[in-house]
């Protein structure tokens, strides 16, 4: 049987998953996206060339890797066409290697209109979504009024589904949110055209994955966002609309629990968050700005500045437990170069008591004050180092402390954005 590895974020997203997925896709059978949409922004740097992927799995830059989009992903037709076009214009063969589940829901124009109108109406209480229709598309999926890839090939059924959806959503858009209605004919024509475009890529993703496992091929499941943004286990309501944790890899592709052999959790050597929501270790000072500048902490999808803070072990341990993480990958170690001292949150002060467990609600998180452990920094340059023994003593001590505090071994350390700026201490596929 083949080996399957799930790669997922162990913080609030933007941990560097795309680079690690690309690194691990050498000699791979397939890479599969299992949740989220084009709100994800996976940045790859290979030989100094930067590529940002939003929907297509990060294995697309490997010539022999099959790339799959599972039923758990919500697909924007316009975003997918644009991304395929950009890659193919750069000489990357996409359509012959990309397979998409017919059960994947579509992000329709009314989902985008709803998302943006709601955020505007919420004002200061906005969640901080990307405004790309992800949440409303998942809402329709659960409400059983979603339009899926499979529906595009039955025009009469598609027309009925679309009219029903627009009757509902246009009422909300015009009567409640006070914005313009979405036009039926334009939306219908665009959907039919996309159906023709995507037809050659439509495939039974679950069946492909089962066959690959029987053939002994390696499969990598690529998560988007991070565990602490999970719709069920994150800082609700400041979360994304899908299951970003390991359970999402199963439900979002159609494989069983026995198909997962290793879970790799990606975490930065510090912490970041985009948008609203609790962030106990956030640094609203020159230290936080320094990390933001050195780490280029601006969203790949939105360009928004990310909130920056110290490593939060309480939150990381929660991600390790929820996902059954087998090993950690610590990224952006080099961003901490030159800092005199580092802090790691090892517990919270919560309502007068010390706790090593995170509250289960956003309000509780907001009331938490971090308890820090200090570590000496290092002045040496770690950028691009690929051997453990060549890291500064203080950097090695910091990593070993993270490993011990999180109760999980570190498998990979990243010291720069390029694929080659990486040291693999334990191969997840070994």
Curated annotation (Swiss-Prot):
Keyword Iron appears in the UniProt entry: no
Designated name of the protein: Adenylosuccinate synthetase
Purpose of the protein: Plays an important role in the de novo pathway of purine nucleotide biosynthesis. Catalyzes the first committed step in the biosynthesis of AMP from IMP.
Protein residues bound to substrate: 300-306
Protein family per UniProt: Belongs to the adenylosuccinate synthetase family.
EC number: 6.3.4.4
Active-site residues annotated for this sequence: 14, 42
Keyword Magnesium among UniProt keywords: yes
Cell location: Cytoplasm
Residues given in the record as GTP binding sites: 13-19, 41-43, 306, 332-334, 414-416
Metabolic or biological pathway: Purine metabolism; AMP biosynthesis via de novo pathway; AMP from IMP: step 1/2
Molecular function, one GO term: adenylosuccinate synthase activity
InterPro entries recorded: Adenylosuccin_syn_GTP-bd, Adenylosuccin_syn_Lys_AS, Adenylosuccinate_synth_dom1, Adenylosuccinate_synth_dom2, Adenylosuccinate_synth_dom3, Adenylosuccinate_synthetase, P-loop_NTPase
Recorded GO CC terms: cytoplasm
UniProt cofactor note: Binds 1 Mg(2+) ion per subunit.
GO BP of this protein: 'de novo' AMP biosynthetic process; IMP metabolic process
Binding site for IMP: 14-17, 39-42, 130, 144, 225, 240, 304
Catalysis: reaction(s): IMP + L-aspartate + GTP = N(6)-(1,2-dicarboxyethyl)-AMP + GDP + phosphate + 2 H(+)
Top-rank taxon: Bacteria
Necessary cofactors: Mg(2+)
Keywords attached to this entry: Cytoplasm, GTP-binding, Ligase, Magnesium, Metal-binding, Nucleotide-binding, Purine biosynthesis
EC top class, as a word: ligase
